Amino acid sequence: MKAVIYNGPYDVKVKDVPDAKIVRPTDVLVRITTTNICGSDLHMYEGRTSFEQGRILGHENLGEVVEIGSGVERVKVGDYVCLPFNVGCGFCENCEKGLTGFCLTTNPGTVGAAYGFAEMGSWEGGQAELLRVPFADFNCLGLPPEAVAKEDDYARLSD
């Protein structure tokens, strides 16, 4: 698949990388149709973070579910979903309190987890053709069919 890869400060390129894949039964794969470039991405682009070279950028994503893990119950292939940038598990103490930005499962020992963001876990970003979404029943916000025509508007919900 093609993805936007961080190579160091002021150096990003679209490269061919291995396809994202389902790793756990609660994962889904989303074909990304829209992704935002956020002002926060500039921190990494300009080298003001410890973002590792070779990582895929992109923490504000939206797209169509193309594959589901065996443990996914709510999300279905073909669903159009918005993916909030915070990656949560949905069942830890913090997630149950609504503090998903401080999930204790997805990036233990630090503040929260996010797709393709410095110091917020090893989750790859969505500036790629495919994105692995963990704990999909919790992290995928289902959108109505008419959302396809307004995907740029709905993508803003991922921030």
Label for each model-derived stretch:
Residues 40-46:
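Cytochrome P450 core scaffold surrounding the K-helix E-X-X-R motif
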Residues 13, 51, 127-129:
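Residue-level marker for the onset of beta-strands and adjacent loop->beta junctions
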Residues 7-11, 35-37:
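Short polar catalytic/cofactor-binding loops
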Residues 13, 38, 64:
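Conserved Rossmann-like nucleotide-binding pocket used by diverse enzymes
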